[in-house]
């Protein structure tokens, strides 16, 4: 934002010109952002070492870029496919066309929306738009085929790098489907004790006839939307966890005398308190995930619906959550 940039420039120039820059007063909120925060929460839930490294839950010499990491995997797959015989593997031709198009920008939107359960069709349309912007493939049918192939490869790469995230996402969706099939909305309680209910119900139409006209009213019925309950639960559950992390951080900042503001995975404080906020937000993330979150969720489902059979919890890795405390790029 140009005005934010201007404000920082003015503030910085005042400090530099001051006889004592270190005591110069600054009211600028300094932002610290998560690294693909939804995937950070999935990696923590799954104790996934590979996923944790990709989204900066562990220390590194430089920030890990999950989008570049996925792009590199996609490129490797396409290079292998390009070597195959088109007579046996028709996508080999598409791979040869796309190897020069694969970059961070091509896959970024799909990686970002993977946390929200992006479908194959959604990924295909996202990648098709990126390819169309570049004008690399003129023929519409060839563009569509290339987008289909690229979407399939991108989702494969995501599944390989974030295997634990995919299994947890699937498990959450299956639990939601089982509950919604009983015409019940999915309910859960966040780690901070906030009860949540997914409000998705089918819409009914009611006709009201008057002497002048016929009015149609749309109102929710008692019938829940099974598909939407299933697809919405994984992202909604993750959002309830990132909201819990923010609230825990905000409360700790208040107790420590820090000014705090934030939007989603962007936490703000004044320049003099950046190091303190860094420490607090890491400590609260570790505290959040040292609790058995998925175990408690399954237990609550089994208690609320004792006659229903839920799938077992997905397998998890052995990532040490306390590594987050030493990761400089977890939020930066």
Swiss-Prot record:
Entry-linked Pfam families: RNA_pol
GO molecular-function term, one example from the UniProt record: DNA-directed RNA polymerase activity
Active site residues per record: 33, 108, 265
Catalytic class of the enzyme: transferase
Any GO BP annotation: mitochondrial transcription
Catalyses which reaction(s): RNA(n) + a ribonucleoside 5'-triphosphate = RNA(n+1) + diphosphate
Annotated EC: 2.7.7.6
Cellular component aspect of the GO annotation: mitochondrial DNA-directed RNA polymerase complex; plastid
Entry keyword set: DNA-directed RNA polymerase, Nucleotidyltransferase, Transcription, Transferase
Keyword Transcription: yes
InterPro entries named in the record: DNA-dir_Rpol_C_phage-type (IPR046950), DNA-dir_Rpol_phage-type (IPR002092), DNA/RNA_pol_sf (IPR043502)
Function: DNA-dependent RNA polymerase catalyzes the transcription of DNA into RNA using the four ribonucleoside triphosphates as substrates.
PANTHER family xrefs: DNA-DIRECTED RNA POLYMERASE, MITOCHONDRIAL
Family: Belongs to the phage and mitochondrial RNA polymerase family.
Name used for this protein in its record: DNA-directed RNA polymerase 2A
Species whose genome carries this gene: Nicotiana tabacum (Common tobacco)
Gene that specifies this protein: RPOT2-SYL
């Amino acid at each position: 934002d140009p005005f934010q940039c201007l404000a920082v420039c003015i503030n910085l120039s005042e400090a530099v010109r001051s006889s004592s820059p270190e005591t110069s007063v600054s009211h600028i909120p300094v932002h610290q952002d998560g690294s693909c925060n939804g995937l950070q929460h999935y990696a923590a839930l799954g104790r996934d070492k590979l996923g944790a490294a990709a989204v900066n839950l562990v220390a590194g010499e430089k920030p890990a870029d999950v989008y570049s990491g996925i792009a590199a995997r996609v490129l490797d797959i396409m290079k292998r496919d390009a070597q195959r015989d088109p007579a046996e593997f028709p996508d080999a031709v598409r791979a040869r066309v796309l190897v020069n198009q694969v970059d961070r920008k091509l896959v970024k939107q799909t990686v970002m929306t993977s946390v929200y359960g992006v479908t194959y069709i959604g990924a295909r349309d996202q990648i098709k738009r990126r390819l169309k912007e570049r004008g690399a493939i003129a023929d519409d049918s060839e563009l569509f085929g290339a987008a289909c192939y690229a979407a399939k490869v991108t989702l494969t790469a995501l599944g390989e790098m974030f295997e634990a995230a995919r299994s947890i996402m699937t498990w959450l969706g299956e639990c939601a489907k089982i509950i919604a099939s009983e015409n019940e909305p999915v309910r859960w309680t966040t780690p901070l004790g906030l009860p949540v209910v997914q409000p998705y119900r089918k819409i009914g139409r009611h006709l009201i006839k008057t002497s002048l006209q016929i009015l149609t009213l749309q109102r929710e019925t008692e019938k829940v939307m099974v598909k939407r309950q299933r697809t919405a639960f994984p992202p909604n559950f993750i959002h309830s966890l990132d909201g819990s992390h923010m609230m825990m951080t905000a409360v700790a900042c208040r107790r420590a005398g820090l000014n705090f503001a934030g939007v989603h995975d962007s936490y703000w404080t004044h320049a003099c308190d950046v190091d303190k906020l860094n420490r607090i937000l890491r400590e609260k993330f570790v505290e959040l995930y040292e609790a058995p979150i998925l175990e408690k969720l399954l237990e609550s489902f089994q208690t609320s619906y004792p006659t229903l059979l839920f799938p077992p919890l997905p397998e998890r890795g052995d990532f040490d959550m306390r590594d987050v405390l030493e990761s400089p790029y977890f939020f930066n």
